[in-house]
């Protein structure tokens, strides 16, 4: 199977999971990125079962609305049973690097209030140690250089994310992103807390404190379901 076929496979598997585990009339939390888009496309076929969705980005909101799925502001929702999203990397504990699509802050907010985080990914995203994929850090623009110095002191290589025309990439929240190369993150939870404590960091794309509860992993032999201990 191609990577796109694996993404569609796990997108459908996530929709099947929601149908089997989330009652009708609920609101679904939805992530951002190409794999999350496959879930949205599969969810559209059963959209009548659910009130709608909470979105983690403007791009996801647009795709949900294109399928006629109602989008709620998180502040309107009392509880969220499930959040479905992809990952750039996931380790054996369910800790992830996320934010390749630029939506890490809103993804982390929505994930934090969901009862269950379902990660959907192809098998290439499963790694023994996080860090081969550059770690995104969303920063207040004036703190960009200061945060870069802190990253360098820890052995990382900070790279400002830019658009095709070379301008700084701006998140939905009006901030910038530093992508950090060259890390091997042996303690994801500790490193997440350390970076989040730096003044000027909005959030780091480590999802360890709130990792995945389960992962639907697309493999050439089908979908593998991995459940992580609480």
Curated annotation (Swiss-Prot):
The keyword Mitochondrion does not apply. Its EC number is 5.3.1.6. The active site is at residue 107. Pathway: Carbohydrate degradation; pentose phosphate pathway; D-ribose 5-phosphate from D-ribulose 5-phosphate (non-oxidative stage): step 1/1. One of its GO terms (biological process) is pentose-phosphate shunt, non-oxidative branch. Keywords: Isomerase. Substrate binds at residues 32-35, 85-88, 98-101, 125. It comes from the Bacteria. It catalyses: aldehydo-D-ribose 5-phosphate = D-ribulose 5-phosphate. One of its GO terms (molecular function) is ribose-5-phosphate isomerase activity. GO terms for cellular component: cytosol. Catalyzes the reversible conversion of ribose-5-phosphate to ribulose 5-phosphate. Belongs to the ribose 5-phosphate isomerase family. Homodimer. NCBIfam families: PRK00702.1, rpiA. This is Ribose-5-phosphate isomerase A. It comes from Burkholderia ambifaria (strain ATCC BAA-244 / DSM 16087 / CCUG 44356 / LMG 19182 / AMMD). The gene is rpiA.
